[in-house]
Amino acid sequence: MNRFDRPTASWDYGEREHHHRPSDPPWEDLPADIRARAIVRAMVANFGECEVTEDDGKFVLSFRGGSGGRLIDEGPTRARGAYLTLRDPGPRTFDRNALPVYCAHCSVNPELQPLEWGCTPTSIEVPAEKPGDPCIHDVYKDVTAMPDEVYLRLGRTPPSSG
């Protein structure tokens, strides 16, 4: 049986890793401007508008959220009860008491999943706090230079401490 013949996928990361883990080249080996450009394209493809700034250590992508931003701005979680809200502060909710479930993919995919694979986070996310706020992606030029606070928020030991 090959990987496409499986009747159902497991939600266990060990099983999903076979299907979704990136291969070559590793994301952290790509130049930061290429990594930032890939994220910008995804945001624009989801109908977001993105502003890019740069400092010595990182690219800062500030965007009006596309799909998830509209969920926050239009309030379907409150108005129609159509979407779940995660209410367990921790790494996948950015330590918040409430986060629309849709927004959790921004902690899982670029932050938690790479760490589980022994890699570095692809970008550091700061989701919108309230309607109208932008979401932020920090794309570090040197992936080993991420602040210790990032690793602590993700429930990990910072590399500088290890």
Where are the regions that the model predicts?
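N-terminal accessory segment detector
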Residues: 1-134, 141-162
